[in-house]
Design a protein with these regions (language model features):
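Tryptophan (W) side chains
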Residues: 2-5
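Short, solvent-exposed loop/turn segments at secondary-structure junctions
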Residues: 66-70, 132, 156, 207-209, ...
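Short hydrophobic short-linear motifs embedded
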Residues: 13-16
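N-terminal small-domain helix-loop-helix segment of the aminotransferase-like
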Residues: 26-28, 39-130, 137
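Conserved core of the PLP fold type I
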Residues: 87, 92-231, 242-263
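Conserved core segment of the aminotransferase class I/II
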Residues: 8, 256-296
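Glycine-centered flexible beta-alpha turn that most often forms the glycine-rich phosphate-binding loop
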Residues: 238
């Protein structure tokens, strides 16, 4: 189709076609918002990215982002290991791989989780682009519009944004100086069910909770596990900070006590480098197939 393009004084392009009237092209398709999916209409930029934009200003000392001190990394050793990997196994390392992640990496991840009392098989591990992708996969699998997700009050802003993108109703459960209060969890479950709502899972950060920083005691972990098991509610245990305690070891991960009801999320973003974007989900056997399909 032959077209003639003209630019008017307002620098808008006009395309003239022999079989159609003159149309004004301003660079944005007509009725663009109407073409979006319903869940995309209210989609907002990540609050975390907004924080990073402010933190990048030279006059700001930011305590907002959980950014590790990369100056402590053995850069020369990491460069040497990377070079050796590419030279000796580059054709494998740079090729397409399984959506579940490289088997040897999953074996190493199991060794890391063993430090927190978790006995896991590499076949149950799904490697993700940071644990943030794991949150997205879980939300995609579980959440329908208006389903309820229980979270600590306050909770990690990145998780809240993900749940809201999938149109979940987020119900906050009270905390104190020791973390999530079990009796408040019971009350939240009763109220939610009385209102006819479906609870899809409880999301919590037991170790050095973001943003409160508290460490959930072992007895509370057991009580919360018992409550959720009795109510048939999955627990999403997000544990980016578990290996960062130096004064005394953290209690064992909740996943160590319940392999069927706890979805465990881990990451190397705090212990190695966030730029690697390596996270993982350790899922119950009943969920593995859905998670693998969602990740591919």
């Amino acid at each position: 189709i032959w077209q003639t393009w003209l630019m008017d004084s307002g620098r808008n392009l006009r395309v003239v076609k022999s079989d159609s009237p003159v149309r004004i092209h301003t660079g944005e398709p007509e009725n663009l918002p109407e073409r979006f999916a319903h869940r995309a209409v209210g989609m907002k930029a990540s609050e975390i990215r907004s924080l990073f934009a402010v933190a990048s200003r030279p006059e700001i000392v930011s305590l907002a982002g959980g950014m590790p001190n990369l100056s402590a990394l053995p850069m020369e050793m990491m460069a040497s290991v990377t070079q050796k990997l590419i030279l000796e196994n580059g054709s494998e390392a740079l090729q397409y791989g399984s959506g579940q992640g490289h088997p040897k990496l999953r074996e190493q991840i199991c060794d890391v989780m063993a430090l927190e009392g978790i006995k896991a098989h590499p076949d149950a591990v799904i490697v993700t682009t940071g644990s943030q992708q794991a949150l997205d996969l879980i939300s995609r699998i579980f959440i329908d519009p208006n389903d309820v997700v229980l979270v600590e009050a306050p909770s990690y802003v990145g998780a809240l944004g993900t749940f809201k993108q999938y149109e979940a109703q987020v119900v906050h459960v009270a905390m104190d100086q020791d973390g999530l209060i079990p009796s408040a969890l019971i009350d939240a479950i009763k109220t939610t069910k009385a209102n006819g709502k479906k609870i899809k899972f409880l999301y919590l950060i037991p170790n050095y909770q973001n943003p409160a920083g508290v460490l959930l005691p072992a007895d509370r972990r057991s009580e919360i596990l018992d409550i959720c098991r009795a109510e048939e509610i999955f627990i999403v245990e997000d544990n980016p900070y578990g290996l960062l305690g130096f004064d005394k070891p953290s209690p064992n991960a909740m996943r160590a006590s319940d392999s069927e009801n706890v979805i465990y999320l881990g990451t190397f973003s705090k212990t190695i480098a966030p730029g690697l974007r390596i996270g993982w989900a350790l899922v119950p056997q009943s969920l593995k197939e859905k998670m693998v399909i969602a990740s591919e």
